[in-house]
Structure formats: structure tokens, C-alpha cells
Amino acid sequence: MRDAYGREIDYLRVSVTDRCNLRCRYCMPEDGIPLLAHEDILSFEQIEAVVRTAARMGFRKVRLTGGEPLARRGVSDLVAMLGRVRGIETLAMTTNGTMLAPLAAALAAGGLDSVNISLDTLDPARYRYLTRRGDIADALEGVDAAIAAGLAVKLNMVVMEDTADAEIAAMRDFAAGKGIALQTISRYSLQAQKGDSAEYDRPPPCSACNRIRLLANGVLRSCLHSDIDMKVDFSDIEGSIAAAVRSKPVHGAVSSTKSVGQIGG
């Protein structure tokens, strides 16, 4: 469906949990963020209902995010549910990969098409520093398992102020050797004084934005930087989605106080 500015909105990002097993320095504080109560998090059946309705309205792509989506117990069951939704052409996931290895085959069998794996360095010590608690061996095992399962794999590398050119070159060589894609993303603050660098890949400009977000608590967010949140009315899901699309601004705010961990992936 089209928004008020003529953009075709056909991409739904679904945060299945606000929990994460890592504490990446650019994403959330070391002590984490205030977590939702379990009873406030959407059930798989509720997520499926929203996705089915979105598909009937013309949405064609769904991406599961978090938090860390694989931290949600039984997420492979959710993938299988969504994999059966008629009209959804692409079912994807963004993950840190550390819990992916034992689940990759089941996720692919359930209908997952692709994974974006966050991997900012190949150096074990730096990986531990950046994630505060992660083991790079787990992430690399996840990459290999995803490839073996037949999933399309893309690495997301956040390039920070102290990232050496040699690290970027090493990651490019690693991705090329695995036959997978690499996207480098400039570390961006949501504050105006630190914008993305044009040297690296960037999110699509507002004029080409085709997505809305469903947060883990059932809130629909039409824009990454938006302060307008709409709770899904499960007696009128179509109306809720339509209202979120209509509320999508022509462009996002110049700055925001939200952290990366608070914007639903």
C-alpha cells in the first residue's frame, strides 16, 4: 500500500523480543535496557495475525529482528508459521549469529530465506571488547551453519571511528572467501552532530523508505526516529496497519534520543 507521499510500503520489520545476549557498545548500555514484562510481548499467534493481515494489504517482505531474535524461545516455530503466510515473498532475519549454528537448518526448513549477521571484526579480543561478552567462535560457527543450510547470508559490519582500514579489508576478504555479501555501515549516532559518512553504505534515504516496524510489545512504528507509536488493535489489525502507514512522515527527525537498542532493529 502507498503512504501519503506516494511511497510503496511493502516491508514489515518485526521485533520478536527486546532481549539480547550481547551488550554491543553502540547498541545498549553494559547493564542493558529496561525489559518488557513477558506478558507484554506479543505471542507468536499475534505476530502471525499481523503478518497475515499485512500480506493481504500488499506487504511482501518480513524481517525478524530484536533485540536478538534467536533469544526468543521457539523462534524456529514462529519462522515456520510465517513461512506459510501467502503473499510474503521474502522472510529474513537480522541476528548476531552467536546462537544460530544449532538453529540454522530448522530456520531454513521453516521458510527463512536469508540472514544478516552482525559481525564488526574478525579479531577475537576486539570482538569481545565490542560486544562486552561475546565469543567470536560462536558467531563464525553461525555464519558457516547458515551457509550450509542454504540461507542467503550478508554480513553487517559497523565501521566505527577506531576501526582500522586493515579490519575492513580483512572482512571483505573473509566475505569473498565465503561467497557471501558484506555491508559496511558507518557507526552513526542518532544525534545530529554525528551523521553517517557517505563513504560507507547507508540506510535508504527517506524518499525510498518502504518499511514500518512492529515492536515486540505490539507497537507499530512508522519511522525509525518517530515518536508516534500506535498499538495494534487486534480487533482491527488492518486499520492499525493503515493508520501507521498514513502516519509515516515525509522524512525522519534530524536527531533523536533513542538508542539503537530502542528502535526495534
Regions found by a protein language model. Give the residues of each.
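Radical SAM/AdoMet-radical enzyme domain recognition
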Residues: 41-64, 68-168
